[in-house]
Amino acid sequence: MDEGNGGVNVKKFLDTLDKTKIKYIGKGILVGTLAGIVVSVFRLWIEKIGEILPVIYQYLKVQPIFLILWTILMLLCAIVVGALIKSEPNIKGSGIPQVEGQLKDEISVLWWSVLWKKFIGGILSVGTGLFLGREGPSIQLGASCAQGVATKMKAGKSEEKILLSSGAAAGLAAAFNAPVAGLLFVVEEVHHNFSPLVWLTSFAAALMSNFVSLTIFGLQPVLHLGDIPSLPLRHYWLLILLGIVLGILGRFYQVILLALEKWYGFLPLPAHLRGIIPFLLVIFVGLFFPNYLGGGNQIIIALGQHSPTLIALFGLLSLRFIFSMVSYGSGLPGGIFLPILTLGAIIGSLFANCAVIFFGLEPTFVKDFIVIAMAGYFAAIGKAPLTAIILVTEMVGSLVHLMPLGLTALVAYVVVDILGGDPIYEALLERLVKGKKTHLTGQRTTVEIPVLAGSKLDGTLVRDFDWPNHMLLALLRRGDREILPHGDTVIKMGDTLEILTDTTHAGDIVRTINEQM
């Protein structure tokens, strides 16, 4: 009797489970495992090559005759990466705009081609000391793994997008040991809404990917700076000033970065061979500053241990800014996440040391401003303050700075907004898809649009809104409820609209509706 009741109870329990969510969590774990392995191997190669680069350049200074061989090797790397870019243009740059374009149905990608070519191209570009980050390629590698899973499972377009999102989160999590930041990046930067299936799948993938990464690299945070004291409230006015400085410099970064393609266009080189320039210039950087090569995490750690002079900091800032622009503008496979954080750390150290001299800041708090400025600078450029705050928190491994991080990120964000700056990855995506011809593909897709506070759609009847052509409002999600809309359905703040359309029109439809909202 008891056994029978037990069986009934188990059946009732299983019936109450949301099988769709459980299924997607399982798929997220699968994606996270694959992405974690791929990205961890990618990261391991870059770190191991980066460890021997200073030794190589020290040897080249002693035996300059071998500079000829090293120059030839760097030229070969540039040519190989150029050939990969020519055969697969979607591996150019960080890869984040391409992933966002996939999710918006503005870019079509062959996952296997991108996966192996980005892997090799990224190692050759980032590993050889160029001022590029591993996080952008890691996000694209994670998304490619997810697309491969979706293809093998013969998933529909909507499911493929959910898995792509989870792969992107997993890629960032494995690159920086930051699973929560990986989730927030997808929610804040990519989707701009909190879809339950997206965040559940992405979080499962990010956690699993991070577990794989921690197994390989250990539990120590990527940017472990030791004990960081809590900043006293009497110094909080400096955070507002720092936020203003970061906002102005962040907007300057955006303007220069978006102008690079035009400037590189004046060179008599095919687009896929522009990487020859940074590959040759990095030799000079390596000879004179071998410890400053790469994305810059070693610089951040060094700044946390001792403060250089103001002149040295300004010189380092100039070098990092200029050569990171030269590196990224060439179109080589590499990201800007870590270079941005490095620039933010240098700005923070420069600002704090000035505050020590002019405003009486205690030197013990210089490390605080290094951490705070990293988040503020990224929040300004990427216009994703939550991601910036949590990313830096997870990378540093300290939870005591959420208030100063939040204040500085908010001020920097507002300043960039006043100066007319757009999120950098959205601006790069617009450049990427600009001028593409549109034609009906006949392939169905679903796009999601959140109804935000202050939207004109809030309180509007479905029939009273001027909907664009080539679309159908298929579903309205309100929390965990799914509502089939009709003309008399009232749209409310917090709803998510699911719109059915052709893949070619998806991007234009989202832009048109957002403009009317």
Model-predicted segments: where are they?
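Alpha-helical transmembrane segments and immediately membrane-proximal extracytoplasmic
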Residues: 1-437, 445, 452-453, 478-483, ...
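Cytosolic Rossmann-like ligand/nucleotide-binding regulatory domains
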Residues: 453-509, 513
